């Protein structure tokens, strides 16, 4: 189970809307309490691909985020990105690029701007997708 603060959800949502029509992206990190992962920090990164169909994180920003995680003793949990025109589920490309089965992938759908949908996923080595429980509080 993943827990995300409402304020951090709002940061992700605002960043995604600001970057429309392109996909937005970032990283998530936090602390573990048994099987629970508490997201303590979201990182808002530049999508250097500048497209609405896929993303690549700015490598300098990505490195700075990882350094910040280490400095603050946070565990890297995975990444997040938006789908401006498609549902909150991993695309075939998302599955193909999911190289680490131990991390979580958060996808924010903006298909309906009045009802954005954020979901968390696990993608295993065989590219099977399961929904991870995500609590926003």
Predicted regions and their residues:
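Conserved, mostly hydrophobic/aromatic
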Residues: 79
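Conserved beta-strand-loop surface patch within small alpha/beta domains used
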Residues: 1-76, 85-137
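Short, well-ordered beta-to-alpha junction loops that form the rim of enzyme active sites
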Residues: 82
């Amino acid at each position: 189970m993943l827990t995300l603060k409402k304020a951090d959800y709002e940061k992700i949502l605002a960043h995604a809307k600001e970057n429309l029509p392109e996909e937005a992206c970032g990283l998530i990190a936090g602390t573990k309490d048994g099987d629970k992962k508490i997201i303590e920090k979201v990182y808002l990164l530049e999508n250097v691909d500048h497209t609405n169909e896929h993303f690549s994180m700015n490598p300098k920003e990505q490195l700075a985020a990882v350094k910040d995680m280490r400095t603050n003793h946070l565990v890297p949990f995975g990444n997040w990105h938006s789908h401006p025109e498609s549902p909150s589920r991993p695309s075939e490309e998302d599955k193909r690029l999911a190289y680490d089965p131990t991390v979580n992938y958060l996808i924010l759908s903006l298909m309906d701007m009045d009802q954005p949908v954020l979901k968390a996923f696990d993608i295993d080595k065989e590219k099977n997708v399961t929904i991870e429980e995500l609590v926003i509080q």
